């Protein structure tokens, strides 16, 4: 029987190189591949693709969810390099950790405007 084994969110950005730099230099991802208008970054078992777009409406409406072991540790790590003032910050920012119907999470907005939610796995 066939078994699905993973999925890769595709984030969008008007500046792919700048987005890759943010995810790698500030958030600890590694470059998997980088083309002119498409890239992949990896951290642990998570891969994110970044695709070029011309219209800012696309990244402003892109959402993804990533499940995490060690949510509190990840939040502490990233809060040293990303603003935690999500509502007032105009660039990259994170929300505080909060409880949602699907679990504890925080959201991160990257420089392109993508919003990625990081959710604690149940054993956290």
Swiss-Prot record:
Similarity-based family:
Belongs to the bleomycin resistance protein family.
Q: VOC domain: from which residue to which, for each copy?
A: 3-121
Organism annotation: Streptoalloteichus hindustanus
Self-association state and partner proteins as the record states: Homodimer.
The alphabetized list of GO BP terms reads:
response to antibiotic
Keyword presence, Ribosomal protein: no
Tell me what gene encodes this: ble
Pfam families hit by this protein:
Glyoxalase_7
Keywords linked to the UniProt accession: Antibiotic resistance
Protein name in the entry: Bleomycin resistance protein
State what this protein does: Binding protein with a strong affinity to the bleomycin family of antibiotics.
- This protein's record includes keyword Membrane: no
* Entries under CDD domains matching the protein: BLMA_like
Q: Which InterPro entries match?
A: Bleomycin-R (IPR000335), Glyas_Bleomycin-R_OHBP_Dase (IPR029068), VOC (IPR037523)
């Amino acid at each position: 029987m066939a078994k699905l084994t993973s999925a890769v969110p595709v984030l969008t950005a008007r500046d792919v190189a700048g987005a890759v730099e943010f995810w790698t230099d500030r958030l600890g991802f590694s470059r998997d591949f980088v083309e002119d208008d498409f890239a992949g970054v990896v951290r642990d078992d998570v891969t994110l693709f970044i695709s070029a777009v011309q219209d800012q409406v696309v990244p402003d409406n892109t959402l993804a969810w990533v499940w995490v072991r060690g949510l509190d540790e990840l939040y502490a790590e990233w809060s040293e390099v990303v603003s935690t003032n999500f509502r007032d910050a105009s660039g990259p920012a994170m929300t505080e950790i909060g409880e949602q119907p699907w679990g504890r999470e925080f959201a991160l907005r990257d420089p392109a405007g993508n919003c990625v939610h990081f959710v604690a796995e149940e054993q956290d």
